[in-house]
Amino acid sequence: MSKLHDKLIGTVPSRIVEQASIALTSYEGRITEFNVASWLQVQGHAGLSVSLVVKYRDGQQQREAAVDHGRTDAVGKILLSGIARLPVKHRIEDLQVHLRPTTAVTAITIDELFVHPVEPVAADRKTAQA
């Protein structure tokens, strides 16, 4: 899918970004995770392939991560959701959610947008369930 057709769905407030915890992983290094979901309608585009993408600035580097992919229904509606795993070396700034359609679209209706940091799992909760 071409980045040329990207449509901004929304910018995540910095107070939400600052609530996210950073985890250290073996393979990806430092990452932070966000739950992302959006109900959208792409007028006049039934069956259109689309992706939900998160874009952000990490220091001076522009990065992006795919969240979900799908096709719009018969009236052009779709729910896209997933966890955005964002590698970070410095600090996440200017976090934005974009729709990436396969073809150019003139108008989208954003029924709902949800972005929230993934809650870290407490160690004592893991042992209590074991």
Where are these regions (language model features)?
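Extracellular and organelle-lumenal recognition/adhesion modules and their flexible linkers in secreted
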Residues: M1-A130
